Amino acid sequence: MNNRVHQGHFARKRFGQNFLNDQFVIDSIVSAIHPVPGEAVVEIGPGLGALTEPVAARMDHMTVIELDRDLAARLASHPQLKDKLTIHQQDAMKVNFSELSEQAGQPLRVFGNLPYNISTPLMFHLFSYTDAIRDMHFMLQKEVVNRLVAGPNSKTYGRLTVMAQYYCNVIPVLEVPPTAFTPAPKVDSAVVRLIPHVQMPHPVGDVRMLSRITTQAFNQRRKTVRNSLGDLFTSEQLIELGIDPILRAENISVAQYCKLANWLSAQSTPQK
């Protein structure tokens, strides 16, 4: 038997398709999302509808974004779902979530079993729309969830950590074994909840500066920040900002990265 075939659909590797089939896990995720009628719920990558069906059962309407043409057509003809779904057959990386929120007249509740091959860039795409999002629940590779929730001074702490925690409160929800999927992935999975901050704990004037600094620091994470960020800050400036120049990227907190970004923005702004 071909283990890439599930419910008559052949899982496409290029789309990173692994279909959830464990009812306990499905029920646990739906309980964590806790959808309520009237909310603007958006699912990314509904696939064969393992999560779509129980969520839609609690809703009058929901929106789904599915890249696979065959799966989108299958959902459109699903007897229990077709009248409840607005289906966008497109790449979620190209979706304007602010427009979806404006159309709904409220912030979005986004969830999905994300294809692991695009999960990180997709989250960065979503971070740019956090003003339009109430919360997000995602099934991800466990290693990615570990990075999202990491603290400073750990090997899993990186640019994704800093940017995710800048935008959101990040909460691990559930660990999921490979046996919960068809075909079974070669890695463990986990569900995470991301709640965009209503008030930023560490406001940054220009988030592009934060992105630039974190990219530069973590691209050279074995170097001290005196070296990795040497073209942006002198050792004396780092010390004045409360950062030891001999620390490495993983030793700098989210708050400290935000402080660096704001200082650099201030230096780049022409004085009146």
From Swiss-Prot:
<dbReference type="GO" id="GO:0005829">
    <property type="term" value="C:cytosol"/>
</dbReference>
<dbReference type="InterPro" id="IPR029063">
    <property type="entry name" value="SAM-dependent_MTases_sf"/>
</dbReference>
<feature type="binding site">
    <location>
        <position position="91"/>
    </location>
    <ligand>
        <name>S-adenosyl-L-methionine</name>
    </ligand>
</feature>
<feature type="binding site">
    <location>
        <position position="66"/>
    </location>
    <ligand>
        <name>S-adenosyl-L-methionine</name>
    </ligand>
</feature>
<keyword id="KW-0963">Cytoplasm</keyword>
<dbReference type="GO" id="GO:0031167">
    <property type="term" value="P:rRNA methylation"/>
</dbReference>
<dbReference type="GO" id="GO:0052908">
    <property type="term" value="F:16S rRNA (adenine(1518)-N(6)/adenine(1519)-N(6))-dimethyltransferase activity"/>
</dbReference>
<dbReference type="Pfam" id="PF00398">
    <property type="entry name" value="RrnaAD"/>
</dbReference>
<comment type="similarity">
    <text>Belongs to the class I-like SAM-binding methyltransferase superfamily. rRNA adenine N(6)-methyltransferase family. RsmA subfamily.</text>
</comment>
<feature type="binding site">
    <location>
        <position position="20"/>
    </location>
    <ligand>
        <name>S-adenosyl-L-methionine</name>
    </ligand>
</feature>
<feature type="binding site">
    <location>
        <position position="45"/>
    </location>
    <ligand>
        <name>S-adenosyl-L-methionine</name>
    </ligand>
</feature>
<comment type="function">
    <text>Specifically dimethylates two adjacent adenosines (A1518 and A1519) in the loop of a conserved hairpin near the 3'-end of 16S rRNA in the 30S particle. May play a critical role in biogenesis of 30S subunits.</text>
</comment>
<dbReference type="InterPro" id="IPR011530">
    <property type="entry name" value="rRNA_adenine_dimethylase"/>
</dbReference>
<keyword id="KW-0949">S-adenosyl-L-methionine</keyword>
<dbReference type="GO" id="GO:0000179">
    <property type="term" value="F:rRNA (adenine-N6,N6-)-dimethyltransferase activity"/>
</dbReference>
<dbReference type="GO" id="GO:0003723">
    <property type="term" value="F:RNA binding"/>
</dbReference>
<protein>
    <recommendedName>
        <fullName>Ribosomal RNA small subunit methyltransferase A</fullName>
        <ecNumber>2.1.1.182</ecNumber>
    </recommendedName>
</protein>
<keyword id="KW-0694">RNA-binding</keyword>
<keyword id="KW-0808">Transferase</keyword>
<feature type="binding site">
    <location>
        <position position="18"/>
    </location>
    <ligand>
        <name>S-adenosyl-L-methionine</name>
    </ligand>
</feature>
<dbReference type="InterPro" id="IPR020598">
    <property type="entry name" value="rRNA_Ade_methylase_Trfase_N"/>
</dbReference>
<keyword id="KW-0489">Methyltransferase</keyword>
<dbReference type="InterPro" id="IPR001737">
    <property type="entry name" value="KsgA/Erm"/>
</dbReference>
<dbReference type="InterPro" id="IPR020596">
    <property type="entry name" value="rRNA_Ade_Mease_Trfase_CS"/>
</dbReference>
<feature type="binding site">
    <location>
        <position position="113"/>
    </location>
    <ligand>
        <name>S-adenosyl-L-methionine</name>
    </ligand>
</feature>
<keyword id="KW-0698">rRNA processing</keyword>
<dbReference type="InterPro" id="IPR023165">
    <property type="entry name" value="rRNA_Ade_diMease-like_C"/>
</dbReference>
